[in-house]
Design a protein with these regions (language model features):
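Von Willebrand factor type A / integrin I
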Residues: 213-281
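DG-centered beta-turn motif at the end of beta-strands
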Residues: 54, 104-109, 191-206
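Acidic/polar low-complexity segments with low predicted structural confidence
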Residues: 1-98
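Surface-exposed acidic, glycine-flexible loop patches that form ligand/cofactor-binding
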Residues: 93-95, 133-135, 182-189, 215-217
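Von Willebrand factor
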Residues: 93-194, 205
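Phosphate/oxyanion-binding active-site loops and adjacent basic polyanion-contact surfaces
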Residues: 46, 50, 116-123, 166-174, ...
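Short acidic, S/G/P-rich loop/turn micro-motifs used as interaction or catalytic elements
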Residues: 111-113, 150-151, 200-205, 231-234
């Protein structure tokens, strides 16, 4: 999966001219060193490796001819040399941490079915692949689903396949991300990206709570990308999410951190890729 995503990210970046990240932020280098008892040394060290020491003592006494009958061994007759003692010693190991953490958010309420969900998920797969290439595979993912309540799910399969028949409160997904980031202090170690896919429905018509959570997110987020995939029956009307994102002025106020893309449900891959360019430009 990781190798395939990286290759797709390379193709998206090179063949489809998706932009390269010029500056990944202050958290670009997240290699650290840890010390583990992985190396062994004879004679001196921190912790005696009893099994390895016993093996070495037996080998020494076999070589000296002090074990004539291997089926009748008396440990009291062993000669023990200081060089037979095997110790584990601390070794400096390089531990790479992920540079980017991506939250994928998806409305899975009753109205999110068929082509709309497929378009959202396809775009999110491509976004993940692009980031894998940009960050040289150092990417972690978290998956959030929401209807009137938000929940985190463990993997992409659940993220893609789960659905319910409830209504929609968009703010719950953004609030959950904020709560997770603050509780786990994730902004300290990661460049954080948030991508939300929806059909534009929201019971919170003026988006007051959603806008509050987005403002709260601006403290740490590298990019928020909102994709609205409209049902064909919407026509020329604006969805609730489009209305309040545009009328609030938040897209202009935070133009370097939040982007909006709107597309119809009958999209092909080329249009999805054009949407990605808009979200990450």
């Amino acid at each position: 999966m990781e190798a395939n995503a990286y290759e797709l990210g390379r193709v998206l970046s090179q063949d489809f001219q998706l932009p390269n990240l010029k500056d990944k932020g202050k958290k670009r280098s997240l290699a650290r060193y840890v010390y583990e008892l992985t190396d062994k040394n004879k004679g001196v060290g921190q912790i005696l490796d009893k099994k390895a020491t016993l093996r070495q003592i037996v080998q020494t006494n076999l070589a000296l001819g002090r074990i004539p009958n291997v089926s009748d061994i008396n440990p009291a007759d062993f000669l023990v040399s200081p060089h037979d003692l095997v110790y584990r010693i601390l070794s400096r190991e390089k531990d790479f941490e992920s540079q980017a953490l991506v939250f994928f958010l998806r409305d899975y309420s009753g109205s999110m079915g068929g082509k709309v969900t497929q378009a959202v998920v396809s775009q999110h797969v491509m976004l993940y692949s692009w980031l894998m290439y940009q960050y040289e595979k150092q990417v972690e993912t978290r998956f959030i689903l929401h209807d009137t309540e938000a929940r985190e799910v463990a993997d992409f399969y659940k993220y893609h396949s789960y659905k319910v028949a409830g209504g929609t409160k968009v703010f719950t997904a953004f609030k959950l991300v904020n709560d997770i980031v603050e509780r786990e202090n994730l902004d300290r170690d990661y460049n954080i990206y948030v991508f939300h896919g929806t059909d534009g429905d929201d019971w919170d018509k003026d988006g007051k709570q959603t806008l509050e959570e987005i403002e709260r997110m601006m403290r740490y987020v590298a990019r928020i990308g909102v994709s609205i995939v409209e049902h064909s029956y919407v026509g020329s009307k604006q969805t609730e999410v489009e209305k309040y994102l545009k009328s609030s002025g938040i897209l202009e106020k935070h133009k370097d951190h939040i982007k909006l893309d709107i597309m119809g449900e009958n999209v092909d891959d080329s249009r999805i890729i054009q949407g990605i360019k808009k979200l990450i430009s």
